[in-house]
Regions:
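Active-site neighborhood of glycoside hydrolase catalytic domains
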Residues: 144-146, 150-161, 165-299
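Acidic, Ser/Thr/Pro-rich beta/coil linker or hinge segments at domain junctions
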Residues: 400-420
Length: 420
């Protein structure tokens, strides 16, 4: 690629964006074929967008404003991001997000701003009631209504017509609206109630998701949902998003976390999970929590894999391994991809009792088992966080004689994070 000037002079170039000519959807999309193919192989049930801290930013200017991400990319202003050195170009805008959902067969989860900024950028009071900026909440509510109308509104509506103008007359697969990201406290719940009432009145069939405080409050195994009745009518909180960032040791201790969660209240959503520590133990430790989630299927749990992908050039200071690492001309599936896919491809809807026979010196071995009524298969999952091979004797209920089994193994080796 070259730009050949016709005469001497100074040139200023903006919005330089190069794509292969054969992108997904016969060259009509902004997504490379290899990246979309990897996502299709994973087969997500939903995609959460625009994600986390991009939603609330550090002030109103840096919040996610979806209307500014429509239209030709050269007209999109982009925005500074707290995740330096990233600067958002918004090349994947609100419209492209829904197109990606359609390409991979996923439902859409849009995370809307509530006018509350990142809690790390506001002053804290003794009551954990962060002093957030004053905003016109009605404007944020109207903006969210416009966003929903753009996604699923009839083409006779203002924003439904705009969607059609941008090449998509049919509605997009919007299913979830998350009200804020990591917003919490009395101010949040006051705003949540107003937003929920306004949105659900017009769009009652969408599923609305509330936020929780990011840290663990009280005892480590406390149910984060227990304080909801102190702030809002619990009937208006259908799904509750819990985020966790902690150590390997903490993750191992959470293997039974959700067993004691109260039933009959908000459904469980783990929108973000990040375990710090040495590879591969940090990655395997996420499995201990995942087992607790799938063992408690009556909580109707949702789980979002994150981070989904990163560019090769921005991996140096990463903490958490993404599922995909993308370069200029390739997309690599990492160990995280394969671990997550093993869980995704082996789900069950009936939980069964399973344990590891007590062996002296055996620690950090995790097990769960269930029955999948669709495939009529029993599924046994084992995770070994020790740095050596071990011989295990799982104890499972309901089997009177030996049975044939198919084994799938994922071996993670220290120092080889990209490919297992």
């Amino acid at each position: 690629f070259a730009i050949q000037p016709m005469s001497k002079g100074q040139f200023q170039i903006d919005v330089v964006s190069l794509f292969p000519s054969d992108t997904w959807n016969d060259g009509k999309s902004v997504f490379r074929k290899d990246i979309v193919q990897n996502l299709k192989e994973f087969s997500p049930s939903f995609i959460r967008f625009p994600g986390g801290c991009i939603v609330h930013g550090v002030n109103e200017e840096t919040m996610y404003h979806w209307k500014k991400t429509l239209g030709p990319i050269e007209n999109r202003p982009g925005q500074w991001s707290k995740w330096a050195p990233y600067y958002r170009t918004d090349g994947i805008g609100y419209h492209e997000f829904y197109e990606l959902c359609e390409y991979v067969g996923a439902d859409a989860m849009y995370v809307m701003p509530t006018g509350m900024i990142c809690s790390g950028w506001v002053k804290q009071s003794p009551q954990w009631n962060f002093r957030h900026i004053d905003v016109d909440l009605d404007a944020y509510i109207q903006d969210a209504l416009d966003a929903i109308e753009y996604a699923i509104g009839d083409t006779t509506t203002k924003w439904g017509a705009e969607r059609a103008k941008n090449g998509h007359p049919a509605p997009f697969p919007l299913k979830y609206i998350e009200i804020g990201n990591e917003d919490f406290g009395p101010v949040y719940w006051e705003r949540y109630e107003k937003i929920y009432q306004a949105l659900s009145a017009k769009y009652p069939d969408l599923i609305y998701i509330a936020n929780s405080v990011i840290r663990v409050v009280g005892r480590e195994n406390d149910d984060k949902r227990k304080d909801i009745p102190n702030f809002v009518n619990p009937k208006n909180v259908k799904v509750f998003d819990e985020h966790y960032y902690n150590s390997i040791e903490w993750a191992c201790e959470q293997h039974y976390r959700f067993d004691n969660y109260k039933r009959g209240v908000a459904d469980l959503f783990i929108g973000e999970l990040g375990i710090n520590g040495k590879y591969p133990y940090n990655l395997l430790a996420t499995g201990a929590i995942r087992m607790s989630i799938e063992r408690n299927g009556d909580l109707n749990p949702l789980f979002a894999e994150r981070p989904v992908m990163r560019h090769w050039d921005f991996l140096e200071h990463r903490i958490f391994l993404p599922m995909l690492i993308n370069g200029v001309d390739s997309s690599v599936k990492t160990s995280f991809f394969y671990l997550a896919k093993m869980f995704r491809d082996n789900t069950f809807d009936v939980c069964l009792d399973a344990a590891i026979k007590d062996i002296e010196g055996l620690q950090n071995i995790f097990v769960t088992m269930g029955y999948d009524t669709a495939s009529k298969q029993y599924i046994l999952k084992l995770i070994n966080l020790q740095d050596k091979k071990v011989t295990l004797q799982p104890e499972v209920s309901g089997f009177k004689r030996p049975v044939k089994a198919h084994k799938t193994s994922l071996v993670l080796v220290p120092g080889k994070e990209n490919t297992p």
